[in-house]
């Protein structure tokens, strides 16, 4: 395969793999029961992101480009899951929203529901507060969350 095509194919393959990974995480009805389970789940996500990063670095060798971009998204989601202090959730989620401006309320709701330790009031407060703040997109940002559909049933249940 010629270099420009290989470069484009590798970048698209990485985007799709990460997209499907995030889709699986967001759509599964996983709910961690304890801080230990959250920690183990988040560490597994970080390990898998590192494996994907290594694979795509090998595939992208010689292109002179950063091949980590999309894999970092998995690690960022893992950080929200791993967080042990629920009072810091708002800060971590707001960092996620500023990094990934296409992330929607449904994604945040699914992520907080997955944690299993967030009250409905806290979820609603976080989502409402984040809706009020403007998000300034990085001009180089390639949207990934806009392609991830989250079952609306979860969000409706969360906010009631």
Feature locations, PLM:
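Extended alpha-helical "rod" scaffolds
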Residues: 1-160
């Amino acid at each position: 395969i010629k270099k420009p095509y290989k470069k484009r194919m590798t970048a698209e393959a990485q985007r799709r793999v990460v997209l499907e990974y995030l889709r699986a995480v967001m759509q599964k009805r996983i709910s961690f029961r304890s801080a230990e389970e959250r920690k183990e789940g988040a560490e597994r996500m970080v390990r898998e992101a590192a494996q994907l990063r290594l694979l795509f670095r090998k595939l992208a060798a010689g292109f002179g480009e950063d091949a980590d971009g999309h894999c970092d998204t998995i690690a960022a989601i893992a950080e929200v899951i791993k967080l042990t202090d629920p009072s810091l959730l708002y800060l971590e989620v707001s960092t996620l929203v500023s990094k990934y401006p296409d992330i929607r309320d449904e994604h945040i709701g699914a992520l907080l529901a997955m944690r299993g330790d967030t009250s409905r009031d806290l979820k609603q407060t976080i989502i409402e507060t984040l809706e009020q703040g403007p998000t300034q997109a990085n001009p180089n940002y390639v949207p990934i969350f806009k392609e991830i559909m989250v079952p609306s049933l979860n969000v409706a249940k969360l906010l009631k």
